[in-house]
From Swiss-Prot:
This protein's UniProt keywords: Cell membrane, Ion transport, Membrane, Potassium, Potassium transport, Symport, Transmembrane, Transmembrane helix, Transport
Catalytic activity entry: K(+)(in) + H(+)(in) = K(+)(out) + H(+)(out)
Membrane topology category: Multi-pass membrane protein
Record carries keyword Magnesium: no
Gene name of the record: kup
TM annotation in the entry: 16-36, 58-78, 100-120, 141-161, 165-185, 221-241, 253-273, 294-314, 343-363, 373-393, 399-419, 424-444
Keyword Transport applies: yes
Protein name, UniProt field: Probable potassium transport system protein Kup
Location in or out of the cell: Cell membrane
Residue pairs linked by disulfide bridges in the UniProt entry: none
Family of the protein in this entry: Belongs to the HAK/KUP transporter (TC 2.A.72) family.
Principal subcellular localisation of the protein: membrane
Length: 666
């Protein structure tokens, strides 16, 4: 990359500042909707809290945001960019060569981040709609929780329903709306604290530590499960690095942190002023004058929708990266907008919708959802910490310093994990089960790929070059196609899968003018699009290594069309004039893509465990996108051939011929 590009990535701008507010901070920016409510309700209500409890809670929130979000993610993790892209899979690609076992924290972290993303829309939208309970004129309608559930589900149906059309047309308003949202948080919090300046004593971490061990704290260390809600969006902040650039996050985060801290302090001040009033409304809405609440609910709903949209888009990106890293099944991906970064995965969209809707119906209130929320993301953060340690060592940090720094964050996050573990019995089990299911699928897919690499045999193309030439020139065979293309992800030098040569020469001899052997390799760089060609000393056998970034679509026909034109223009490939065509001057013949599917046979070499892995992977394949769709071959001529995983395994079964016995009397 050029220095100017790097500078642009680290540079901040006014437009970038606004865009960052709309993309990066949706999750962490809507946490004030429910964090203080969770703390107060778990303590027994507003009338049960003391000044020391409130000061301790605010102190815990401030220092959690400082340690985890500011220091770990903004100051450390943002430096771990993979060609300007962030997130746990981008981080994994930076360190995966350091140890093969690092695939484990990457898979666990990705799975828990996905499962958390399914819960976020339910929590944020429900919390926003519940604010209608505090609106004069509407409170009598929305005191009935069923009406809140119906309204929430309608919003979710619309939100997930528009994903297929792309969200670029509404994405332009995300930034301005979130700027208004954060400004409101800051201003309202500021005015609420004017009468209770003692709130600012919470900056002293003494109050945080005192509360953890105070008898006034009814929940003990488990209070951290509610405190953690304030920083759940930190991982999303890192994942969205590539969308806005490091410089814009550096500039916008101080503004965002100031506004949300003011909001928490303002809610705390309202609680101290009204703890004997008997009011049991959410402090976030109750701390605002009643005549403004309807506008606040509208703004909060928009902010919740924006936060949910960011999580949905992030889930699509996460799954797309996992597919290209070959640790997740292939699902159909579409690009509804002009931007490659704006993608849509139908299966994932409707799975998220189903899980989110079931969460709303099962838990009914935001308070019950909060009881289950946050457990998964603590695991994601722990996995990111593990990968960050290896990244720091790779970048030259002294190992002892890298170990100490990451051990500190791992300890803090492990304490939050233990505090959140109690949520397992209050609904967190649903998120854990979902995460385990995703990890299981990832493990099966990854292990199945390794088994194929272990057993599939390769042959040297040079040894069969003469046979292929004879077949090409043998007019006794009808021309199968002008160009025959084989896709293989296991092509190295001149070695190629035995199944491909078996398809060309044995299964049905395929006579063609040119044989193409294409290997698609996913690179660690997100947006690479390069290729390398080896003609093997011929003009009829072409080996193509196609290098695509892990965020690039693998639409092979488009790339191959460009490669063919380049080879013909350079004279390395003869032109293929067409006698019959509606396109004047067309000099490229027809193509047929041959896809080979390896299936498990009764091979004795496979262990029972390996057979289970391969059979399970085959079952998963039935509900995923076909390679034809994944490689963009829907409008091309495609032949699918099935071969056994182990071609050499030919069993000679004992069998006897029945010979007719002559009649003895004859």
């Amino acid at each position: 990359m050029s220095d100017s590009h790097l500078t642009a990535f680290d540079k901040a701008s006014k437009a970038g500042f606004i865009i960052a507010l709309g993309i990066v901070y949706g999750d962490i920016g809507t946490s004030p909707l429910y964090t203080m409510q969770s703390l107060v309700e778990n303590q027994g209500g507003v009338n049960q809290v003391s000044e020391s409890f409130i000061l301790g809670s605010i102190s815990l929130i401030i220092w959690t945001l400082t340690l985890i979000t500011t220091i770990k993610y903004v100051l450390i993790a943002l430096k771990a960019d993979n060609h300007h892209e962030g997130g746990i899979f981008s981080l994994f690609t930076l360190v995966r060569k350091m140890s093969p076992w690092l695939i484990i924290p990457a898979m666990i972290g990705g799975a828990t981040l996905l499962s958390d993303g399914a819960l976020t829309p339910a929590v944020t939208v429900t919390s926003a709609i519940e604010g209608l309970k505090a609106v004069p004129g509407l409170s009598h309608i929305y005191q009935n929780q069923t009406n809140i559930i119906i309204t929430t589900l309608v919003i979710l149906i619309v939100l997930f329903g528009i994903q297929r059309f792309g969200t670029g047309f509404i994405g332009k308003i995300f930034g301005p709306v979130m700027f208004i949202w954060f400004s409101f948080l800051g201003v309202s919090g500021f005015f609420n604290t004017l009468g209770h300046l003692e709130i600012f004593k919470a900056i002293n971490p003494y109050y945080a530590l005192h509360l953890l061990f105070s008898p006034e704290n009814h929940r003990g260390i488990f209070i951290l499960g509610s405190i953690f809600l304030a920083t759940t969006g930190a991982e999303a902040l890192y994942s969205d690095l590539g969308h806005v650039g490091r410089g814009n996050i550096y500039v916008s985060w101080p503004f965002v942190k100031m506004c949300i801290v003011w909001s928490y302090c303002g809610q705390a001040a309202w609680i101290l002023a009204n703890k004997h009033s008997g009011i049991e409304l959410n402090p976030f809405f109750a701390s605002v004058p009643s005549q403004l609440r309807v506008y606040l609910v509208s703004l909060a709903t928009l902010a919740a929708i924006i936060a949910s949209q960011a999580l949905i888009s992030g889930s699509f990106t996460l799954v797309s990266e996992a597919m290209r890293l070959k640790i997740f099944p292939l699902f159909r991906v579409t690009y509804p907008g002009a931007n490659l970064g704006q993608l849509y995965i139908p299966v994932i969209n409707w799975i998220l919708f189903a899980v989110t809707s079931c969460t709303v119906l099962a838990f009914r209130t935001s308070a019950h959802m909060e009881a289950a929320y946050g457990l998964a993301i603590t695991i994601t953060m722990l996995m990111t910490t593990i990968l960050l340690k290896y990244y720091l060592i790779k970048k030259g940090t002294r190992p002892i310093l890298a170990h100490l720094a990451m051990a500190f964050f791992a300890l803090v996050e492990f304490i939050f994990f233990l505090a959140s573990a109690i949520k397992f019995m209050h609904g967190g089990y649903a998120v854990v089960i979902l995460a385990l299911a995703i990890v299981f699928v990832m493990f099966i897919w990854h292990a199945g790929t390794r088994i194929v690499f272990k057993y599939v045999k390769s042959l040297n193309l040079n040894d069969y070059k003469e046979q292929i030439k004879q077949l090409r020139d043998d007019v006794c065979f009808d021309l199968y196609q002008t160009n025959v293309v084989y896709l293989s992800n296991r092509m190295q030098d001149h070695m190629i899968d035995r199944s491909i040569l078996y398809s060309i020469l044995d299964k049905r001899p395929k006579r063609a003018q040119v044989y193409w052997f294409v290997n698609v390799q996913v690179t660690d760089e997100p947006y690479t699009a390069k290729y390398k060609v080896d003609m093997m000393g011929t003009d009829y056998m072409v080996r193509v290594n196609l290098y695509l970034g892990f965020r690039m679509p693998q639409t092979v026909p488009r790339y191959l069309r460009t490669i063919v034109q380049d080879l013909m223009e350079s004279g390395r490939l003869p032109k293929q004039e067409q006698e019959y065509t509606i396109t004047p001057g067309r000099d490229v013949g027809d193509f047929r893509f041959v896809l080979i599917e390896e299936r498990v046979s009764n091979a004795r070499q496979l262990s029972n465990f390996e057979r289970f892995i391969m059979q399970t992977k085959a079952s998963i394949k039935h509900v995923t996108a076909s390679p034809m769709r994944w490689f963009g071959l829907q409008y091309s001529e495609v032949t699918l051939e099935v071969v056994p995983l182990i071609l050499s395994d030919v069993l000679k079964l004992p069998i006897k011929e029945l010979v007719p016995v002559e009649d003895s009397e004859a």
